[in-house]
Amino acid sequence: PRSTLFPYTTLFRSPSLKAYGISGRARLFEAVQQVKKANAERLRKAPGHKFTGTSSDAIELAAHPELELSYITAVPRMAHYMEHSTRIYNIYLKYIAPEDIHVYSIDEVFIDLTHYLSSSGLNAREFAKRMIQDVLETTGITATAGIGTNMYLAKVAMDIVAKHIPADENGVRIAELDEMSYRRQLWSHRPLTDFWRVGRGYAKKLEEVGLFTMGDIARCSVGRSNDYYNEDLLYKLFGINAELLIDHAWGWEPCTIADVKQYKPESNSVGSGQVLHCPYDFEKARLIVREMIDLLVLDLVDKGMVTDQIVLTVGYDIENLSDPVRRKAYKGQITTDRYGRQVPKHAHGTANIGRYTSSTRLVTDAVLELYDRIVDKSLLVRRLNISANHVICEADVPKENKVEQLDLFTDYAALEKKKEKENAALEREKKMQQAVLTIKKKFGKNAILKGMNLQEGATAKDRNAQIGGHKA
């Protein structure tokens, strides 16, 4: 067992590193800090308080307290992981029909085994183990499985229970939960953030009113109307989302894989975001926004989609407050980030384009006007998120059917001519976008670049070589 990390956010950390308090998705700097703490403790216990060497092998480290803990920092290979993910999915298809599999992420699937157990003569644990064994023999990769009477319990069984039980001789961990065993085992479990769909924000709100466990939430949901702790308190905190939280506190989940497959959202959005590798000033961050718009709009064109609204969120860097000069100059609101550090409150706004479009020109004009209006020019930027809302198929754009009051002073012929000219320009732009997409698909995303992509600080060229923000 080796101590292994993937920069910059850990996609995975080995169980060996987990033993030293490093979480699964720690930032690399957090992992470095935790390793320093671990080595300080090892040095205190080492013979003569000196290290004689280093090791990243857990067994060797356990046997030799005089060795300093080290670790391997491995660069992610997302294309390689996706290839293996596809291979594993195809193994599942040997046992399960695709309509009974929901791909949740690159390394997780939900499977409905209900209709397969009687015909196979196996119980759920045996069936899961057979598939896991096939994956191991075919790919050399082991797996962890959670079995539950619904999707929520299966997920929690894997995330919380399976990861805390000993593995078998092949490294396989399988855990099972039903509603009653969930309540017995996990109603007192902490922290709440270990549970599916409970983030830091939810946990903080719950803890502020004295609710620290799923058992607390379940008890609160059955409180009397004149009690402080009752379901009204939860609905006041979370609105309609309290219904899902209450269900999960009791181990209930009505949604099935069939429901997931049939679901069609009322509204669609497409977005992208990035954390800059260093703080950017106003103008350099504006360049990144232009690049992100360009890629976002090309994605819309490729999918035959259009939008009429863009949402922009700009997060500021901690240096704005850690630098005494900058802090003295800043007079705005201050918030705390997920690491407990003070930062200026982020900028957030919406640009309404006025028509459904996938025009780079129209979207860029609208978003840059918004950026110039909401972003503090004196602050350093660290995070950018752009989302296209109300996304629909181009063929579904509603036809204009507006009634207009005519007057004697407007040149309607000139207006019509202007409209025709604008439509012709948009059509030319679309043909150019489609040509760009054709070239990129044939020769690679960096086969054709704009001048802005070569400016100092531009990130599009590097990001084109990534998958999901990680090296391909």
Where are the regions that the model predicts?
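Short, small-residue-biased leader/transition segments that mark boundaries at the very start
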Residues: P1-L11
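A short glycine-rich, hydrophobically flanked beta-strand micro-motif that places a catalytic Asp/Glu
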Residues: S3, A143-I147, D308-L312, R382-N385
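Gly/Gly-Pro- and Ser/Thr-rich, intrinsically disordered tail segments characteristic of DNA damage-repair
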Residues: T9-I257, A413-A472
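Glycine-rich beta-alpha junction loops
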Residues: T149, Y316-I318, H390-I392
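Short clusters of hydrophobic/aromatic residues that line enzyme substrate/ligand-binding pockets
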Residues: I174-L177, L192, V270, A351, ...
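DNA-contacting surface of Y-family translesion DNA polymerases
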Residues: D194, Y202-V381, N401
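Acidic, metal-coordinating catalytic segment for phosphate/diphosphate chemistry
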Residues: G340-A472
